[in-house]
Regions:
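ATP-binding/phosphotransfer module of carbohydrate and carboxylate kinases, centering on a glycine-rich
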Residues: 1-58, 67-75, 94-102, 119-126, ...
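Short beta-strand segments
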Residues: 8, 60-64, 131-137
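A cytosolic small-molecule/anion-sensing beta-strand core signal
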Residues: 20, 63, 144-145
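Hydrophobic "anchor" residues
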Residues: 24-25, 78, 148-149
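Short clusters of small/polar residues that mark proteolytic maturation junctions
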Residues: 30-32, 83, 153-154
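A charged helix-plus-loop insertion that forms the helical arch/lid used to bind
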Residues: 73-89
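General beta-strand structural signal in soluble alpha/beta enzymes
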Residues: 104-109
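Glycine-rich phosphate-binding loop of actin/hexokinase-like ATP-binding domains
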Residues: 124-180
Length: 312
């Protein structure tokens, strides 16, 4: 059975694993992303793969930034660089391929997550599916017939930039990222709890929010639930818009705060409220089917390996 080397380059760490073509994990590890140049990153990646060069048949990399498909750009050039601005314009795929003598593919991290969930997670067996990852913004991707939808400029699936309110002047502070990234939940819950102190707000992370929901006093539980419901309704409204455009069979939602079942209970409950507004000739509007993503922090490695398998 063929073995591949999967790499997930993040802003704080580089995770790696040796993965079979059936998505079984072998050796794995991580190193800090303590690099200041593209050359340093390449040296580190080459050092990680080096001991396995005789064992693996290819290297799949998930990375931040704008990245075209392998067919459109086999050099795996990273545009913008995302969390690693020094990678802007760097042909990571070509440079590492020449260094290692192995096939190398590079895919955007959000798209990698979507393809990973298709290969081995919540989107298995689905013809059209979407993944939305709740972080600082909303990462994600769209999978159609087993391939990630790239779009004409590689920008398909960049859900963070969707505008929330078309009746207001354009404002980067009124996007799906700001309303539905985890800070959006933090801010809504803080308002309900009457928190304005910066230190208190900083302490109100996802873990604390759900801790209060489960173990807080009656007034705290009610306040957190109101904030969570408001967050869920904003999230669901965007999913309904995406349903109209893409019509996926499944939306898989992942990210740190998605681990708590209370989030999905709120998303399901508020989706009923949102869909109740679609009446008359709109009553047959399909209800978005929202499920938890399944692969957690490994999703990008799964997707990186799946991308590499597509070109071997």
């Amino acid at each position: 059975m063929r073995q591949l080397f999967g790499i997930d380059i993040g802003g704080t760490s580089v995770k790696w694993a040796v993965v079979s073509e059936n998505y079984e994990f072998g050796d794995r590890g991580s190193v800090p992303t303590a690099f200041v140049s593209a050359d340093q990153l390449v040296d580190a990646l080459a050092a990680l793969v080096g001991p396995y060069r005789g064992q693996v048949v290819g290297v799949g990399i998930s990375a931040p930034g704008g990245i075209f498909s392998y067919e459109a750009d086999p050099d795996g050039t990273i545009h913008r660089g995302g969390a690693l601005p020094y990678m802007d314009g760097f042909p990571l795929g070509r440079v590492l391929r020449e260094r290692l003598g192995l096939p190398v593919t590079v895919v955007n991290d959000g798209k990698s997550c979507a393809l990973g969930e298709y290969a081995a997670g919540a989107l298995r067996g689905v013809d059209v599916g979407c993944v939305a990852v709740i972080g600082t913004g909303i990462g994600g991707g769209i999978v159609v017939d087993g391939r990630v939808l790239m779009g004409a400029g590689g920008f398909a699936g960049e859900f963070s930039f969707l505008s929330n309110n078309v009746n207001e002047p354009l404002d980067h502070c009124d996007t799906f990222a700001t309303s539905s990234g985890w800070h959006g939940l933090q801010n809504l819950v803080a308002v309900e709890l009457g928190i304005s102190d910066e230190a208190e707000l900083e302490a109100l992370d996802g873990r604390r929010i759900f801790e209060l929901l489960e173990h807080g006093g009656a007034s705290e539980v009610a306040a957190v639930q109101r904030g969570l419901d408001a967050y869920a309704e904003l999230f669901d409204r965007v999913l309904v818009n995406l349903q109209c455009v893409i019509d996926p069979a499944v939306f898989a939602v992942g990210g740190g705060i998605s681990c708590h079942p209370a989030l999905f209970e709120a998303l399901d409950r508020k989706m009923d409220d949102v869909m109740a507004h679609y009446t008359g000739f709109l009553k047959d509007m399909p209800r978005p089917h929202v499920v938890p993503a399944q692969l957690g922090n490994d999703a990008n490695i799964y997707g990186a390996v799946a991308t590499c398998l597509q070109v071997l």
